[in-house]
From Swiss-Prot:
Protein function: Regulator of autophagy that contributes to antagonize BECN1-mediated cellular autophagy at the endoplasmic reticulum. Participates in the interaction of BCL2 with BECN1 and is required for BCL2-mediated depression of endoplasmic reticulum Ca(2+) stores during autophagy. Contributes to BIK-initiated autophagy, while it is not involved in BIK-dependent activation of caspases. Involved in life span control, probably via its function as regulator of autophagy.
Effect of deleting the gene: Premature aging associated with a shortened life span, probably caused by mitochondrial degeneration and autophagy. 8 week old mice begin to acquire a set of aged appearance phenomena remarkably similar to those of premature aging syndrome, including prominent eyes and protruding ears. Ocular abnormalities are observed: mice develop opaque eyes and blindness, which is accompanied by cornea damage at 20 week old. The opacity of the cornea is due to debris deposition in the scar tissue outside the cornea. In addition, corneal neovascularization is observed, possibly impairing vision.
Membrane topology: Single-pass membrane protein
Taxonomy of the source species: Eukaryota, Metazoa, Chordata, Craniata, Vertebrata
Source organism of the structure: Mus musculus (Mouse)
The protein's name in its UniProt record: CDGSH iron-sulfur domain-containing protein 2
Biological process according to GO: autophagy of mitochondrion; regulation of autophagy
Ranges per topology, Cytoplasmic: 61-135
Amino-acid positions noted as binding [2Fe-2S] cluster in the UniProt annotation, renumbered to this chain: C99, C101, C110, H114
Family that this chain belongs to: Belongs to the CISD protein family. CISD2 subfamily.
Amino acid sequence: MVLDSVARIVKVQLPAYLKQLPVPDSITGFARLTVSDWLRLLPFLGVLALLGYLAVRPFFPKKKQQKDSLINLKIQKENPKVVNEINIEDLCLTKAAYCRCWRSKTFPACDGSHNKHNELTGDNVGPLILKKKEV
């Protein structure tokens, strides 16, 4: 039953459809087609365009995929939210840099790991820098 339907489509209906298409004999003949002729050609041209795209798609360059979709890959993963609290009065340095990319080996302090992260992912993250006000 199903094969009979497929055979009928391939052997009878498809050839009849293709015979009725207003395909001109030359390239200049396309300019003489009417709007109704173009509308009858539209499904056929759409199928040809789809098949052409599917044929050449494997040769298109692949999109660059991000290597790291998660931000925090390893720091305090047992906690539902990582929070580091630092008292500003306790800063004995005049300047401190804190990590925002989660790649630092000295987290929460920044060790410059964001540079490699930015290079790999195209991101632009940098450290949080705290400075003491000069009086």
